[in-house]
Regions:
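FMN-binding flavodoxin-like domain, especially the glycine-rich phosphate-binding loop
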Residues: 1, 5, 14-114
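Acidic, amphipathic alpha-helical patches
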Residues: 9-10
Length: 114
């Protein structure tokens, strides 16, 4: 079952088999709401080790937020990553939307153990 959330409490992250974070790059960084969830999860010692993590996002000029998200998921939480992250300049085109679908499919296959 796929559940789309615009906000998740840190303890809800532990219930998921996989987490895909979406964050635009804002002033060369992850957006504050995504950062807050990660920081709250870290403070609460939410166990995400071995869970599957991925990231996507948009940017206007720099685009590093998706890589930063993956760094936190790997280094702080010990998650298994699906790489590379998807970073899109402004709005996705048809090919980039297809990349997003493939990312979702890859995550689902990893959950299923394929």
């Amino acid at each position: 079952e796929v559940v789309l959330k615009y906000y998740a409490r840190p303890e809800e992250l532990a219930e998921a088999a996989a987490i895909i974070f979406g964050s635009p790059t804002y002033y060369h960084d992850i957006t504050l709401p995504i950062k807050q969830v990660m920081e709250e999860a870290a403070k609460a010692n939410v166990m995400l080790k071995g869970k599957i993590g991925a990231a996507f996002g948009s940017y206007g000029w720099s685009g590093e937020a998706t890589k930063q998200v993956l760094e936190v998921l790997k280094n702080r939480f010990g998650m298994t990553l699906v790489e590379p992250p998807i970073a899109v300049l402004y709005e996705p085109n048809k090919e980039q939307l297809e990349q997003c679908r493939k990312l979702g499919k890859t995550v689902a296959e990893k959950i299923a153990g394929k």
